[in-house]
Amino acid sequence: MSAPHIVVVGGGLAGLAAALECADAGARVSLFEARPRLGGATWSTSHRGLEVDNGQHVFLRCCDAYLGLLDRLGVHDRVTLQDRLAVPVASPGRPLAWIRRGALPAPAHLARSLLGFHPLPFAARVRAALSARRIATLDPDDPALDRVSLGDWLQLRGESDAAIDGLWDLLVRATLNQPAREASLALAVKVLRTGFLDRADAADVGWSRVPLSRLHAEPAEAALRRAGAALHLRASVDALECRAGQSPLLRIRGAALEPDAVILACDHESAARLLPGSAGVDTVALRALGRSPIVNLHVVLDRRVLELPFVAGFGTPLQWMFDRTQASGVERGQVLAISLSGADAWLGRSNAELRDVFLPALAALLPAAREARVLDFFTTREPAATFRQAPGTRALRPPSRTSAPGLFLAGAWTATGWPATMEGAVRSGRAAAEAALADLRVSRAREAA
């Protein structure tokens, strides 16, 4: 009996994880990606001799599936993962504050950092520590938590505006791509419990030391080709048909393709366009997931102004800033990447407008930047970086299985229980692959019997 043929539509992290899982299980895999590259929302480009990422991506030690993908690709040596959580927080005119992992067991390991977080008054720090203790008891799978925002919940507990917009935003905005006031409490609890509170080492921060294309797309392409997968770039799927009692039919460049299974691993808006009603997926709900942007600012300076790998901001429009000098291939000076999540306010601003806001903010935050000469300043924008992780989205996210035989969904927008992160994307791809392989094994066993 020949190996089953599985088609994966989409070459982002979800699609790559699904394709590798299927190929490793012995399936014949074909991957179709509309763009000329793999990697999805994690990609690199050249700009005036610099190699830069579209945006800064980090992961945490708790991201088991993502770390497993790095191991499968053989690129674990291309990332840095902290031995112990240590996040420097800069605010104008103040010394650095630190969020560090202490020696106490979880969740008390962060108590000293929260109580010593000097950008907030002491009373606000105590309230934040008490809120963290309460969050550690909440169930992220409780549907009631998805009906309220983290900000509203914190306000009901007496948290100040400074604490909500400063400390709590710092902890969840980069992960949920939403400010704390607009983020689903359920997803925030997932982030805070899994990432910070349940395990003492869970929040140790990791990042790539190389451009993202060298971390994901290039090694994944090589691994898939070694596994015998067929890769088709610049190949858009024109239509998807679900037929009663049969596997799906794809139409690509006018040709019909009838694999044993299809894993639809594109973004949720593309999935909503492709999915027929017979798939049993609520495409109105998919469209209602919306989109949330990320804007990244790239600043090239004639000297070093940041002597840390990264720093978070408090009381400044700068959210997170990373030293990308080595990864960019620059030998002198410094390249900074400033990541702005939930960036609705910045998405439509021109490069000049962003420069006028963020260069003074950079100088206010890092005194050394006041004397530095700006050699270049440019932006990369992801208008649909993630779905909008607001209250009410839990019910909109579909499972990996559909009601159509042989059709499965993957993507960070599916019902993984995780937010729209690299970890969520990889988990979704693996779940879809496991479901497809399990169904094919059952189907073939029935045929053999």
Task: Give, region by region, the residue ranges found by the protein language model.
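Mobile amphipathic helical/loop "lid" adjacent to a hydrophobic cofactor/ligand pocket
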Residues: V52, Y66-L67, D71-R72, H76-K190
